Amino acid sequence: RKALDKMATKAKEYYFVGDADQTIFEFAGSDADYYHRLSRNAEQLEQGHRCGVTINSLCKRIMRPIWNYYGYERVWKPTGFVGDHYYLPSLQTNCSAMEALLDKIQNTNETFLFTYRGTPSDSWVKNFFKREGIEFAHVGNNAHVPKKEIRCHKLWPEFCRGKPMSLKQIKDFWDYAGSKVIVRGKGKETFEDWIDREYTIDYLINKKFLKSTASEERDFSLIRVQKGKKEDYEKRLIYIKKILNKGFNDGDVRVKYANIHTVKGLTFDNVVVDLTMTRPEDYFTQLRLKYVAYSRGKFDCWTVASQGKYTLGVR
């Protein structure tokens, strides 16, 4: 801070890299008030290059009380896209806004961020994904269920019907399949000395790697080795079947979720913001968090109403 004060008084020209309006780590020592005062008279870059008109206007309304308090204005020119703002009473409510969200997740290749202030919103979001059969991942982590696991469920019936599969895919089958189809003593096979080409189920049966009845077992969930608690395992299988019934996309996971504090600096096509808070917080802190949340999106945004006593961004 002393270095910044000295720079601001002696340097003829200096640059701020960042945004005082996104100062959300006060719990870690960040001084939002200082950054607001330091940057309020600075010449600003005007083009945002991210948010469409609707999200841009929403973010300006969110930040207006802070701008008025510190006596500055931000231009924040939007992109050419307009976009829509939808309202959800909850993630369990069937309504036109929910239909629009599910339709866009299912029928476009756009990305989605579900973000929130904290618990228990994280559990609500994950339960929503599982209920709707939506592939998802936490920001910065792998998918909740690996692609290769879902792929095994999808491709095993085709393999049983005689379609050749790559050696890599056969290795993936081996990671999950059990003694119902694999010959005793072959469960730990690594296939390291096998030629990297396609193989049929008949080939593996003839070579005594799969049992003679393997091709009759068309449901991969019935030949897998159970891992973890039975209840959790069964829920996992139900979730996988929902994904397959909706049409499995083998591309990157497009739906992510995370706490607002972990999404700063990220960009998604669409954003879903849960306004639930479980305790009171400084009003300006709430506004900065709310702004960070919505400004991750480029096109459309959904607001999920607070499910408790406190609402993010409301005194």
Question: Language-model segments: which ranges?
Answer:
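The feature marks helicase ATPase cores and/or their adjacent C-terminal helical subdomains
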Residues: 1-315
